[in-house]
């Protein structure tokens, strides 16, 4: 199935479910690492909300693209802890926290809500009672009533696209990104342009929807996968997709995958530069940029001394967030072979010395009026 429409992507874009060894819940250590780096930005956003004269009785916060790992629990705990701190400082009496957890319909909401222990949300007798609700649906459209949210958080979700970029086949119906699943050094310029155009369209839709839902002077804290350099085909920003394409091509050569399935598949994700993100926000004009920064991190797997252990652990992380969409295109029956091949490529081609991963932290405030 070619991922040419938003409806198709929405059906298959989710992290691996459950709590098994290939699940996202068990393989989200890197995004936890990213979230810990972004925690000060979230803390500052809550502080900022208290400095703006909202006369709050309840703070309404949304975590968009929450998945089902422990990262969402850390977000809730951080917001709640900062609210309790400010309440003690300001002698607030009846402040409550309402958190909306959003992701697409295929998300493992059962595992997510099973993890919402009293340690995360506390109890209703505490100084800041916390109430949690699930909100399934695409964040590229409206999810909440007008002027209903004070704080929006999203981590490692906004770089996913509503569909594979348009215009990646010729008039004759030939694939323009043959043998690849993302931008690469061999991709023609039209592929790069199509990916940036799709990200521009989708991120603008995201901002437009939030501009209607967030109250004036409300805050958004967005963490997304990105890149430091201007070249989107730089190995640091596309190595995961490049290695996956190599693994798929190996199975094509063995007759296990039809070549046309590889040629017509383009991953619906884009790792933008800081300049591209900034430009889209400024063009939209609904939010001011309070803070934007990029930072590079080694994956936690790099702490392992043995290259095979590093490679296998990295494969589990990649499988956790790619298997549903990859399986939908190429078939569940060859997933074990595919990710085993991926491990061998990681170890032999890179000696499991993985490039650093770039993340972008973006803090926005809704313009008043």
UniProtKB/Swiss-Prot annotation:
Induction: Down-regulated by drought. Changing residue 269 to C: Increased caffeine synthase activity, but reduced theobromine synthase activity. Binds 1 Mg(2+) ion per subunit. Mg(2+) binds at residues 177, 263, 265-266. Its EC number is 2.1.1.160. It catalyses: 7-methylxanthine + S-adenosyl-L-methionine = theobromine + S-adenosyl-L-homocysteine + H(+); theobromine + S-adenosyl-L-methionine = caffeine + S-adenosyl-L-homocysteine + H(+); 1,7-dimethylxanthine + S-adenosyl-L-methionine = caffeine + S-adenosyl-L-homocysteine + H(+). Belongs to the methyltransferase superfamily. Type-7 methyltransferase family. This is 3,7-dimethylxanthine N-methyltransferase TCS1. It comes from Camellia sinensis (Tea plant). The lineage of its organism: Eukaryota, Viridiplantae, Streptophyta, Embryophyta, Tracheophyta. The gene is TCS1.
